From Swiss-Prot:
The gene is dxs. Mg(2+) binds at D144, N173. One of its GO terms (molecular function) is thiamine pyrophosphate binding. Homodimer. GO terms for cellular component: cytosol. It comes from Brevibacillus brevis (strain 47 / JCM 6285 / NBRC 100599). PROSITE patterns: TRANSKETOLASE_1, TRANSKETOLASE_2. Transmembrane segments: none annotated. The keyword Zinc does not apply. Pfam families: DXP_synthase_N, Transket_pyr, Transketolase_C. The keyword Metal-binding applies. It is an enzyme of class 2 (transferase). InterPro entries: Dxylulose-5-P_synthase (IPR005477), THDP-binding (IPR029061), Transketo_C/PFOR_II (IPR009014), Transketolase-like_Pyr-bd (IPR005475), Transketolase_BS (IPR020826), Transketolase_C (IPR033248), Transketolase_CS (IPR049557). This is 1-deoxy-D-xylulose-5-phosphate synthase.
Amino acid sequence: MLLTTINDPQDLKKCTQPQLHTLASEIRQFLIETLSKTGGHLAPNLGVVELTLALHYVFDSPKDKLIWDVGHQAYVHKMLTGRREMFPTLRQYKGLCGFPKMVESPHDVWETGHSSTSLSAAMGMATARDLKKEKNHVVAVIGDGALTGGMALEALNHIGHERKNVIVVLNDNEMSIAPNVGALHNYLGKIRSTENYQWAKDEVEGLLKSIPAVGGKLAHMAERFKDSMKYLLVSGVLFEELGFTYIGPIDGHNMELLLDTLKTAKHTKGPVLIHAITKKGLGYAPAEADSVKWHGIGTYKIESGDTPKSAPTYTSVFADTMMKLADEDHSIVAVTPAMPAGSGLIPFGQKYPDRLFDVGIAEQHACTFAAGLATQGLKPVFAIYSTFLQRAYDQLIHDVARQKLHVIFAVDRAGLVGADGETHQGMYDVAFMRIIPNMVIMAPKDENELRHMMKTAVEYKGGPISYRYPRLPTRGVKMDEELQVLPIGKAEIVREGKHVAILSFGHVFEIAEAAVNQLQEEGIKPMLVNARFCKPLDEELLFRLAKEGYDIITVEEGSEMGGFGSAVIECYSRAGYHGMNVQIVAVPDYFVEHGSVKEQRQEVGLTADHIAARVRSLMPISKGVVEA
């Protein structure tokens, strides 16, 4: 097997061009077989096999800098840079990361996870190279979806203005393609940038005719992103006006064409943009047929493509409840930044196509767009992953909270997220939202309470409000028939107890409850509280606990710094209860890497055993006090 002889890009350079085709086939087979056992981002990587081989064949990594936007399509890059044998540990605890990781290899020159960052990083590296008078190439690979992000467009503007030697490879795959005819064929006549275009023209035209969905994709994006995006992707003129030499569109699976194009770009002065058309999931029929499903996948059967049946999740409960609420209240609309499937909003969009707004990878715009909707009496539900809400922080403060607008933040993937690791952990939403005036922050103990919080949010009249929920299966609790409006800022005492009160915020209630059950078998009976709200806190309850002499343990799956526990401590400090003993069980002040949620919780101490041990240490007998 030729692939087993490739342990470094220098090994790849010894291959003949015909051998590269053999390698491409072997790599696809390796990906399909390995990911069937580990799960991972299959479709994106099947789509960049030839492109990745060509990049490492033409350029000299790590001297030449290869940057992968988002990074989920870097598996082939990892295979070619000495990490093939680590793939059985992909995305597992202490195993191979699913994204570029500098500590893994000097060939990973930039760590990614969020989209649209590669071009800014490339510009920084190219500028540093020039200041240091070094000689190397900087190449950024970015998808057509990520290119719509404002940060990427800002970087294009800067690169073009400075005329830096940066090569941008636009990986135009089928993630957003609709099956109708578009204007890409006419686009070919406008390309004038390289000498190799004339001999490649007939081949490229044949490619486009053989993939009719490409034109449909551009038409679809033109419709979604109006004239600006049509101008961007249907015409190379804009890139050239920005200062780039534009090459393309080319077949991103034609090895010879890729090699020639990259060599041309390598010797072109100034910024270059190569527009490569690739097919997501190429080489595995199920992934080609449904690139959305196979973008990120769990384990599967290779022959059939069957995946294990998944249990109901908090996201699916959110999706069902959104439909119920929208049926009753026609002012409810949904906003998502390119995540309608992940956020569970596809059924909502099918039933209410004029009430779902997918604005693309544009979190800042999405947040202020929702604010604009709210000024006109609509009730926008901004469905966004916790990790991506970080990208709209100024808009959250300046455009939503400051104006006290009724925008509902449905914060999905809150807490530890497992295999996607540190770039996707939902650790910080509570901390960064808690300090914003006018904001209400909720977190349910289970899926039934999530539904009530969703009802509470749409009925709330006081400004912005949020609820956070995890990327986890539901608990399977009984669901109430009628949705209730919860009193703002009021906690729920689930079990009365003595000496110690456990205040649980959010879905970690299950862990706190397990700790209490364990302790009760030992005759220890702490109070168990479902906090429900981080802002406003239930101060009446907190002051009662202080007056009655309770020690307090707060439990949350979020940042220890600035989170729910910090809010409790601050509350006591403001009220003058300076002697209160409040211990925080949360995620410590470091980035938690990939693994299962169970393993991550064990690492950070978010377990029933850990909480129970904390409680025991606070009981009177542990302090040397004998109860009467």
